Structures are given as structure tokens and as C-alpha cells.
Amino acid sequence: MKSKPIAVFTTAGSLEDARKLATTLVEQKLAACAQISEIESFYTWDKEVQNDQEFRIMFKTTKDKYKDVEKAILKIHSYDLPAIYAVNVDELYKPYDDWVNESIK
């Protein structure tokens, strides 16, 4: 039985770091695909509001791969406290879902 599709997100401080994360997880078959977008983030750190340019990486994978994806991100991430979260995908075009599952076997 196929595992449920999820999208896992994290951010990186540079395009180089984002590309390293994306390439590594796809090469390790932890994600079928990774997409990188430039974003502007606002957050509180050390009791002060921060504003940084970052790169969001979205990994297309399955629920049964989440823990391995999280471990792989933590192993190479440059942040002390990276945001790593998953979103369930309730509906997905079946041929694409098949491709995701096949790509991470």
C-alpha cells in the first residue's frame, strides 16, 4: 500500500544551502522533488524582531519518509533551530502521486 503524500518545508539562509538540501534529499530518494523559492521572513529571536531574506524549500515526499527527511535536514542544516514541518496532501493527481511514490523507492 502506498504511503500518503506530504509536503515538507524548511528554510535556508542562502541559495547555496537551499540547493545543497534539495539536491541531497532528492539524491537520497527521500524526496521525489524539491522546489526553492526566495522569501522574506519576519520572526522573533533573542526577544527582538528579525527580518531576513531566506529560501524556502518544499520537498514532495510521503508520510512514511518524514522522520528520515527530518534527520537528513538536521544533519546538514546551518541553523541552530530550523523550521521543519509537514503538510498533508489530501488530494493529488493520481499519476503524479504514483510518480512521487516510485521516485522515492
For the regions a protein language model found, what residue spans apply to each?
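Positively charged, small/polar-rich N-terminal and surface patches that mediate targeting and assembly
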Residues: M1-K105
